[in-house]
Amino acid sequence: MTASRPKALQTFCLLLPLLVWMVDRSLCYKPVIVVHGLFDSSANFKNLLQYINESHPGTNVTVLDLFDNKESLQPLWKQVQGFKEAIYPIMQNAGRDGVHLLCYSQGGLICRGLLQTMPDHNVDTFISLSSPQMGQYGDTDYLRYLFPTYVKSNLYRLCYTQMGQTFSICNFWNDPHHHGIYVNVSDFLAPLNSERPEPNATDWKKNFLRLRKMVLIGGPDDGVITPWESSHFGFYDENETVLEMKYQMVYQDDTFGLRSMDYRGAITVYGVPGVVHTMWHSNQTVFKNCIEKWLT
């Protein structure tokens, strides 16, 4: 019997990796938190949930059911606070392993608000899916529905008022022909970018840089995010010529940590043609090529 023990131990050691894999493959997958966009709800993300469950079985995925549909027009700082209260317990349960944030459209700005204002967040990877990170300036069906008497060139007259800033879309309306007014009036995007003196800027930058990775996804056929390069932190100059991320003041001055993240190789950018705005979270090719590998 004594001689058989080493052989049994050897067999056990050989089988142990297989046993661990069989017990719980999900141990290697971090929780995923999904934040929806304007006029969306958790019901819009059934395909995305299916893709994640098929590729990473057992992953804890939470699609937050807050500020749905018309409620998504609430001011963005109010939404940031609401989502923060819902997300914080998930982060705490994840502990040192951390979580991933997958945030679509307007939700990408809400997630930036979370990342910059939470000193103890444990977000590993932030996936910004067709989100107007540098703002919005363009006529879209959404705008015509919300403000039928206003078009691109005139919307600043409403958005850059105290009343206008009570609408989420006005919180990131960035008119390049009225930049000075935007900087002074914007309640959300301008302070988030530290485009004007912000007392919390140093802390917000430190919080943002807790991220390990940021993935930026967008494309030229989006049809809603205008310019579409805003999803990559590009934006118009005063002549409506798009300047890419590295030529933006927020990058060059590293106002909230964008350049620092880029310098450490922590930003990945995907430009995907042929995808309209409402299909980013339902397109399996986008998931396979741009999202799946980051959810480990």
UniProtKB/Swiss-Prot annotation:
Enzyme class: hydrolase
Major subcellular site: other
Cystines in this chain: 103-111, 159-170
Function (record text): Catalyzes the cleavage of thioester bonds from S-palmitoyl-CoA or S-palmitoyl-N-acetylcysteamine (unbranched structures) but does not have activity against palmitoylcysteine or palmitoylated proteins, branched structures or bulky head groups. Conversely, hydrolyzes both long and short chain fatty acyl-CoA substrate.
Catalyzed reaction equations: hexadecanoyl-CoA + H2O = hexadecanoate + CoA + H(+); S-hexadecanoyl-N-acetylcysteamine + H2O = N-acetylcysteamine + hexadecanoate + H(+)
Compartments it resides in: Lysosome
Pfam families: Palm_thioest
Key words of the record: Disulfide bond, Glycoprotein, Hydrolase, Lysosome, Signal
Signal peptide residues on this chain, from the entry's feature table: 1-28
Name under which the protein is recorded: Lysosomal thioesterase PPT2-A
InterPro entries for the chain: AB_hydrolase_fold (IPR029058)
GO CC, alphabetical: extracellular region; lysosome
The protein's Enzyme Commission number: 3.1.2.2
GO molecular function: fatty acyl-CoA hydrolase activity; palmitoyl hydrolase activity; palmitoyl-(protein) hydrolase activity; thiolester hydrolase activity
Glycosylation sites: 53, 60, 184, 200, 239, 283
Top-rank taxon: Eukaryota
Residue numbers annotated as active site: 105, 222, 277
Tagged with keyword Signal: yes
Similarity comment text for this entry: Belongs to the palmitoyl-protein thioesterase family.
Keyword Membrane: no
